[in-house]
Amino acid sequence: EHARCIELKQACYGATAGIQLAKGHIALNPESRVLVLGSDISRYGIGTAGEVTQGAGAVAMIISKEPRILALENESSYLTADVMDFWRPIYSETAFVDGKYSNEQYISFFVNVWEDFKAKYGATLADFGAICFHLPYTKMGMKALREVLDEGSEADRERLSAHYRTSTVYNKIVGNIYTGSLYLS
């Protein structure tokens, strides 16, 4: 009853935007907790290329000053562009996607963000135990990861690849839940 509620609709970034808003709220109200939900139904037309990736599900996360599972860092890099690779118009129950173009954009965005992150913070692959991905389908993230793996040592490549495979287990079962797929990983 005495709660704030906001709904964001953005397939790739909605849950992450919710987490960013929650971090700001926690900074101002350190004793509070914020519930962030990422949920969706990905539905594509019968016989379309996207049909095999569809799914439905949700993730729920409680954001607080004292996290128990995952601590969020303040360092970040991001990229926004108006890319017509995927969309679900208000008038349609099914989404539309240009799969090849979408893959190209996903990989390009990942590489661009990685290059920016390295430039800002001097990061290398050795600095990461694992990298989580937004996964419209599970091979998509690996295609992006492969673009940067050669920058690391053999140990880095093995560690990040192994953790990537582990992170896809639930996504393979559930299918694409859009914004929640990153946190399902």
Roles of regions detected by a PLM:
Residues 27-60:
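Flexible, glycine-rich active-site loops centered on histidine and acidic residues
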Residues 1-33, 39, 150-181:
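Conserved catalytic cysteine-centered active-site region
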